[in-house]
């Protein structure tokens, strides 16, 4: 693996991508949180000597087609099989406090991305422990969920999408907003990427 592309979810102008306002007035905005997380991941990888690229440095939303084009251009430069895109998100349910936990998604079918997703899954399971459910889909023998998201479907290189707990679950959200929670989400990604960098997967 020669390059890791970090995609930081939605932009500041995408409506509805935030937690409820909790009783103490606190809340979380997905675009701002994920950008902060991605910057910390990028710094951690830089310190480890691992090449990475932040796909969307802008705060505003960039169309999926443009994001895919950017990713494919980078993959063409470093080699499609030697590039991995990681799209980092926060999850949300239909109703407040009805879901909790961590997920990883890949495009439908059996692909190389499934192997990479399993590394992230195992790291998340180790770091989140018994605090939160690990929401896997084991129908095909892998824990990743097959999803038709454009950012993982249309990229030429392997790609995964992580859903890092539910921002509309108060328990999940308060953990995400804590120093421990923020560092845990960073560590899930940095440690997983380091494993892939050092492995022959």
Region annotations inferred by a language model:
Residues 1-27:
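Short glycine-rich His-centered loop
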Residues 2-4, 31-201:
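Active-site-proximal helix/loop segments of hydrolytic enzymes
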């Amino acid at each position: 693996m020669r390059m890791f592309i970090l995609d930081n979810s939605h932009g500041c102008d995408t409506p509805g991508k935030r937690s409820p306002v909790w009783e103490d007035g606190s809340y979380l905005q997905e675009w701002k949180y994920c950008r902060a997380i991605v910057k910390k991941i990028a710094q951690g990888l830089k310190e480890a000597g691992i090449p990475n690229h932040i796909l969307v440095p802008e705060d505003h939303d960039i169309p999926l087609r443009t994001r895919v084009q950017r990713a494919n251009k980078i993959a063409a430069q470093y080699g499609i099989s030697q590039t991995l895109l990681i799209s980092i998100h926060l999850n949300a349910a239909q109703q407040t406090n009805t879901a909790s936990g961590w997920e990883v998604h890949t495009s439908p079918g059996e692909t190389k991305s499934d192997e990479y997703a399993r590394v992230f899954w195992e790291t998340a399971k180790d770091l989140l422990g018994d605090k939160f459910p690990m929401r896997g889909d084991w129908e095909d023998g892998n824990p990743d969920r097959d999803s038709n998201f454009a950012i993982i479907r249309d990229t030429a290189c392997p790609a995964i999408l992580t859903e890092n707990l539910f921002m509309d679950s108060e328990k999940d959200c308060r953990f995400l907003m804590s120093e421990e929670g923020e560092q845990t989400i960073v560590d899930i990604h940095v440690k997983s990427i380091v494993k892939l960098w050092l492995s022959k997967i």
